[in-house]
Amino acid sequence: MSSNDQQRGGVADKALQLVMEMKRNPDVLPPYNADLVRQCQKKIDELFHKNAAVVERMRNGLEHDPSLLQPRLAAMCHIRRCMMAYVNERKNRIRSFRWRYGGALPASVRNALCEAEIQFFNEYSSTLARFQSNLGEAGVNLLLHTAPPKTLFVQVRTLEDYGEFETSDGTQVQLTKDSLHSLPRQDCEMLIRQGVLELVH
C-alpha cells in the first residue's frame, strides 16, 4: 500500500470513529469530539487543495496524471458523510432531551455539548415554547401527558432539596431530600424528568 493510500485510509478511519462513537453509546450522549472533527475538516481542506492544484496544472499542460483526483474526491465524500452522520445523530438526541428534561438540561448532558449545540438546544426550546403558547387561549404544554395516566395521583420520592413547590390546585408542598409525597401526575412530570423526583412503585 502506498503512503498516499495509508494517509487517506487513516483519516477515513478517524472519520468513521465519529460514527462508531455514537453507535457505541446509544443511551447517552458522549462529549463532542472537537479534536477529531477538526482533524477531519483539516483533511478535507488538504485533499481539496491538492486536487485543485492538480486541476490547475492540467489546465496549464503541466500535469498529465489525474489518477489521484478520484480517490481524493472519494475520501473527501466519505469523511464528509461521516461528519454529517455524527452531527445529525447528536442533533436528534439533543432534540429528544428537550422532550425528556424540559428546558433545564442536567449538568451531565450540558457538559457533553459544544457551544453550538447549546445554542441549538436553546433555540429549539424557544421555538417549542412559542409554538405551545400559541395553541388555544392559554397555550398547551406538549411535554405533559406523553403517555396515558393510570392514576391522577402518583407516589414520588424527592431526590434532592428542592424547596417549596406549588401544585396546580394551589397546594404548597415542601420538597426535601428523601421525602415522600402523593402529587398530581401532571404537576410532577417535569420534576421527574429533571431528576428532582422519582416514582415510587
Swiss-Prot record:
Keywords: DNA replication, Nucleus
Family (UniProt): Belongs to the GINS1/PSF1 family.
Role noted for this protein: The GINS complex plays an essential role in the initiation of DNA replication.
Domain of life: Eukaryota
Keyword hit for Ribosomal protein: no
A single GO BP: DNA strand elongation involved in mitotic DNA replication
Subunit structure: Component of the GINS complex which is a heterotetramer of gins1, gins2, gins3 and gins4.
Keyword Lipid metabolism: no
Coarse class of the protein's main subcellular location: nucleus
The name this protein goes by in its record: Probable DNA replication complex GINS protein PSF1
Underlying gene: psf-1
Pfam family, one: PSF1_C
Organism for this UniProt entry: Caenorhabditis briggsae
UniProt subcellular location: Nucleus
Lineage summary: Eukaryota, Metazoa, Ecdysozoa, Nematoda, Chromadorea
Classification via CDD domains: GINS_A_psf1 (cd11710), GINS_B_Psf1 (cd21696)
GO cellular component: GINS complex
Sequence intervals crossing the membrane: none
